[in-house]
């Protein structure tokens, strides 16, 4: 690799909209994200399971085949 054309890779503070910050490596000066592992529903255990039903359920409901 040619050193003079490669971007500088350095540690950067990543800021989430929830206020959480952590350090990661990047070629950018700063990184802002909307969601991180501290506030994402999958990681916090607060996710909602919504079952609307699939195509078969909709078909049965439409033609009253329950």
UniProtKB/Swiss-Prot annotation:
Binding positions for Zn(2+) per the UniProt entry: 16, 18, 36, 39
Role, per record: Binds the 23S rRNA.
Cofactor(s) required, per the database record: Zn(2+)
Pfam families cross-referenced by the UniProt entry: Ribosomal_L31
GO-annotated cellular components: ribonucleoprotein complex; ribosome
NCBIfam families to which the protein is assigned, alphabetical: L31 (TIGR00105), PRK00019.1 (NF000612)
Keyword terms, alphabetized: Metal-binding, Ribonucleoprotein, Ribosomal protein, RNA-binding, rRNA-binding, Zinc
One GO term of the biological process aspect: translation
Superkingdom, natural source: Bacteria
Encoding gene (name): rpmE
Family: Belongs to the bacterial ribosomal protein bL31 family. Type A subfamily.
Quaternary structure, from the entry: Part of the 50S ribosomal subunit.
Entry keyword Ribonucleoprotein: yes
Disulfide-linked positions: none
Note on how the cofactor is bound: Binds 1 zinc ion per subunit.
Species of provenance: Clostridioides difficile (strain 630)
UniProt keyword Ribosomal protein, yes or no: yes
Protein name: Large ribosomal subunit protein bL31
Molecular function per GO: metal ion binding; rRNA binding; structural constituent of ribosome
């Amino acid at each position: 690799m040619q050193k003079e054309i490669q971007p500088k890779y350095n540690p950067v503070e990543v800021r989430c909209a929830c206020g959480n910050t952590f350090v990661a490596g990047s070629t950018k000066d700063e990184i802002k994200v909307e969601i991180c592992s501290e506030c994402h529903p999958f990681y916090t255990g607060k996710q909602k399971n919504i079952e609307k039903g699939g195509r078969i359920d909709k078909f049965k409901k439409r033609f009253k085949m329950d």
